[in-house]
Swiss-Prot record:
It is a single-pass type II membrane protein. It comes from Homo sapiens. Its main location: membrane. Detected at low levels in mammary gland and mammary carcinoma. The keyword Amino-acid biosynthesis does not apply. This is Putative inactive cytochrome P450 family member 4Z2. Its cofactor is heme. GO terms for molecular function: heme binding; iron ion binding; monooxygenase activity; oxidoreductase activity, acting on paired donors, with incorporation or reduction of molecular oxygen. It is found in: Membrane. The gene is CYP4Z2P. The chain crosses the membrane at residues 10-30. Belongs to the cytochrome P450 family. It comes from the Eukaryota. Residues 31-340 are lumenal.
């Protein structure tokens, strides 16, 4: 009796392994193809510029995004779907009413963008969802009590006044002023004083220059990675030149946040410093450390690191962008500036 094809295959493990790999590859291709078809059907009502079947809109997006976006917004005033590679599509919304509708929905967070952000910020409030997000939100909630926030106003106003004084000195020598870096220092100065009880002023010294440089480069590389579909794969990105640079700055960011946490832990061990800490109000970091000591199961060291990174980065970067954008709009539309 001749052996069956299955018996022959079992007798050659290498061929069996090849068959298994090919089957898994075929399954993945079919899954991605079905996802592409579903996305096309879901977005068919929204007009979009022609896209290459493999590269998507890579020819014009995002290399020249500041040149392309105004044109896209004029041509597609409500929203436009843009493909990044053959299987990933980003839905760019331009109309505020569309944004309202989207924010009212309970859709899951973007898998691609949050995976990339999570690779250096960690699993904090920005990237979490579900029950763990609710637990973390409950932990940090006391730090946003209105009575505590009122105390911060004085600290923030001092940081703003310091920035304005620097502007007056600069304008006396040069009529042009690049705002973003100054605003970034001011917001980080405010957050470090209010949330982490940082002594001194970041705007006057260069103690956090390495942190700011790391955040800037990590944000830049993350944005570039998001728009390169090949780099969506962790393994491909890790061994790319950008991945190596990303790893270097990510390590610097981790070391900085780790130092902030360890310094506070050491101060709590020191009896004299502990008395000083207890006399002042509890800040954001105190609340996180307290939560970790009370419940190590639901709030680990990694969770602590993630929330510190999230609050430092998301807190100062988003605020900086918003304030800079407001300044730009006020300068572009002086009639509204007069009304303010």
């Amino acid at each position: 009796m001749e052996p069956s094809w299955l018996q022959e295959l079992m007798a050659h493990p290498f061929l069996l392994l090849i068959l298994l790999c090919m089957s898994l590859l075929l399954f993945q291709v079919i899954r991605l193809y079905q996802r592409r078809r579903w996305t096309i059907r879901a977005m068919h009502l929204f007009p979009a510029p022609p896209a290459h079947w493999f590269y998507g809109h890579k020819e014009s997006y995002p290399v020249k995004e500041f040149e392309v976006y105004p044109e896209l917004m004029e041509k597609y005033p409500c929203a436009v779907p843009l493909w990044v590679g053959p299987f990933t599509m980003f839905f760019n919304i331009h109309d505020p009413d569309y944004v309202k509708i989207l924010l009212k929905r309970q859709d899951p967070k973007s898998a691609v963008s949050h995976k990339i952000l999570e690779s250096w910020v960690g699993r904090g409030l920005v990237t979490l969802d579900g029950s763990k997000w609710k637990k973390h939100r409950q932990i940090v909630k006391p730090g946003f009590n209105i009575s505590i926030l009122k105390i911060f106003i004085t600290m923030m106003s001092k940081s703003v006044r310091m920035m304005l004084n620097k502007w007056e000195e600069h304008i006396a020598q040069n009529s042009r002023l690049e705002l973003f870096q100054h605003v970034s220092l001011m917001t980080l100065d405010s957050i470090m004083k209010c949330a982490f009880s940082h002594q001194g002023s970041i705007q006057l010294d260069s103690t956090l220059d390495s942190y700011l440089k790391a955040v800037f480069n990590l944000s830049k590389i993350s944005n570039q990675r998001m728009n390169n579909f090949l780099h969506h794969n962790d393994l491909v990105f890790k061994f790319s030149s950008q991945g190596q640079i990303f790893s270097k700055f990510n390590q610097e960011l981790h070391q900085f946040t780790e130092k902030v946490i360890q310094d506070r832990k050491e101060s709590l061990k020191d009896k004299l410093k502990q008395d000083t800490t207890q006399k002042r109000r509890q800040d954001f970091l105190d609340i996180l450390l307290s939560a970790k000591s009370e419940n190590t199961k639901d709030f680990s060291e990694a969770d602590l690191q993630a929330e510190v990174k999230t609050f430092m980065f998301a807190g100062h970067d988003t605020t900086t962008t918003a304030i800079s954008w407001i300044f730009y709009c006020l300068a572009k539309y002086p009639e509204h500036q007069q009304r303010c």
